[in-house]
Amino acid sequence: MMITQDFTKPIDSATVLQKIVLDKAQWVKAKEKEFPLSQFKQNIQNSDRSFYDALAKGTHQKPAYILECKKASPSKGLIRAEFNLEEIANVYKHYASAVSVLTDEKYFQGNFEFLPLVRDIVSQPVLCKDFMISEYQVYLARYYQVDAILLMLSVVNDETYRVLADLAHSLGMGVLTETSNEEEFERALALGAKIIGVNNRNLHDLTVDLNRVVELTKKYADCIPADVRIISESGIYNHKQIHQLQKVAHGFLIGSSLMGNQDLNNAVRSVIFGENKVCGLTRAQDVKIVYENGALYGGLIFAEHSKRSVSLRQAQELVTAAPLRFVGVFQNQEIDFIVKIASQLQLYAVQLHGAETEAFITALRQQLPKNTQIWKAISVNTEAQSAVDFTDDLNVDRYIFDSQTANQQGGTGKTFDWSLIPENLKHKIILAGGISPNNVEQAIAQGCLGLDLNSGVESSAGVKDQEKVRLVFNNIY
């Protein structure tokens, strides 16, 4: 079967997509002259990494992740000026089910030369993300060692799709079939697509609607075969979105939100695992365990009367054990002391767990390094029945809502009434107090930014229990 679809003529009244496809047809024509298929076809070998097997592992409970290498886009312009593929791939290899690489030159500043550079570093299948309209591009993608291609049903008709998909399969490659509306989703099902991507971005005007994947999967729920995997594409910026959409999607393709973050490793961890903290760390092996299980933050307690208090010397050893974002916990201590510890340990944040006033916080903010956040614990009595009375302080980046008993603030091992959490501040609240494997699912359901774990994952004060840590994080993501 030959492709008869003419890509040199406008595909519809679309603007951005139409222009990209018209330019792509010109690019293909020029590339074929510059590097004819006859020069490299005989050197092509089939892929030995299965894209389908890698994505088949994705479930609603444990989604698959296609993490993307993207320098720029039409909607955002330049996203990552320091586009170091070696650095990016060395992060992605620890978390991805597959790695996507943009190869469109004009609109995304991509290049086919990027593909083998990434594939040499990662063990996962590599996806060539481009506007595929010709057999030449499919051969070229495999020549550059990719394991899967993207076929967009907003671009190709059914005849073209079959030709390109069949060719990809004959070369051992998989296909990510992209849809963006009901008609395209129906076509994907009829074409027998194994991995169906739902692009939440409107390619005509570049707006994003995360409800698209929800609406399409619900409407066609009875038509989607059990072995087909649904991938949500575009618009994913945080773990809360993952948690909401994994009910309908088996995986996520994430690019722009990661590429725009200089701290790529923690950006990936934040999206996949959420913003969760394990506090009261006293042993290097525990720091490693909580990092490996998905914690983003590690809490080091400097409050004098805590059973989990550490010295500066101990803390200096702990912060080298794993690249957590470390948070120092202080209680009614002098500003000079807090600033000294924060500076020497290069803390990500200082957490105030005492009666620190707004004036104290303002003064602390002026003396702390600019990139060190201030977190404030709000202690809620375990017997409390009325709403928490406090005013949001703009100098506070995160609130820790924790349990308080008559004798103790924090580390009580008890929960408070979670219905008292202010709904309008959940986006900057981390929930603490008695969270354990037994109640972590209910804690997640409160919809806070993240969870703060301590005594609920310990075997004794300051000693984390590896199995409890594993059980909690298994429920979190």
UniProtKB/Swiss-Prot annotation:
Lyase recorded as keyword: yes
Chain positions covered by the region annotation N-(5'-phosphoribosyl)anthranilate isomerase: 276-477
Domain of life assignment: Bacteria
EC number(s) reported in the record: 4.1.1.48, 5.3.1.24
Gene Ontology biological process terms from the UniProt entry: L-tryptophan biosynthetic process
Segments for region (Indole-3-glycerol phosphate synthase): 13-275
Gene3D superfamilies assigned: Aldolase class I
InterPro entries: Aldolase_TIM, Indole-3-glycerol_P_synth, Indole-3-glycerol_P_synth_dom, Indole-3-GlycerolPSynthase_CS, PRAI_dom, RibuloseP-bd_barrel
Alphabetical UniProt keywords: Amino-acid biosynthesis, Aromatic amino acid biosynthesis, Decarboxylase, Isomerase, Lyase, Multifunctional enzyme, Tryptophan biosynthesis
Catalytic reaction annotation: N-(5-phospho-beta-D-ribosyl)anthranilate = 1-(2-carboxyphenylamino)-1-deoxy-D-ribulose 5-phosphate; 1-(2-carboxyphenylamino)-1-deoxy-D-ribulose 5-phosphate + H(+) = (1S,2R)-1-C-(indol-3-yl)glycerol 3-phosphate + CO2 + H2O
UniProt-listed PROSITE patterns: IGPS (PS00614)
Molecular function GO terms recorded: indole-3-glycerol-phosphate synthase activity; phosphoribosylanthranilate isomerase activity
Pathway: Amino-acid biosynthesis; L-tryptophan biosynthesis; L-tryptophan from chorismate: step 3/5; Amino-acid biosynthesis; L-tryptophan biosynthesis; L-tryptophan from chorismate: step 4/5
A Pfam family annotated for this UniProt entry: PRAI
Family per similarity comment: In the N-terminal section; belongs to the TrpC family.
Subunit-level organization: Monomer.
Primary role: Bifunctional enzyme that catalyzes two sequential steps of tryptophan biosynthetic pathway. The first reaction is catalyzed by the isomerase, coded by the TrpF domain; the second reaction is catalyzed by the synthase, coded by the TrpC domain.
Entry-linked PANTHER family: INDOLE-3-GLYCEROL-PHOSPHATE SYNTHASE (PTHR22854:SF2), TRYPTOPHAN BIOSYNTHESIS PROTEIN (PTHR22854)
NCBIfam families reported for this sequence: PRK09427.1 (NF006945)
Official protein name in the record: Tryptophan biosynthesis protein TrpCF
Originating species: Haemophilus influenzae (strain ATCC 51907 / DSM 11121 / KW20 / Rd)
Taxon lineage: Bacteria, Pseudomonadati, Pseudomonadota, Gammaproteobacteria, Pasteurellales
Gene: trpC
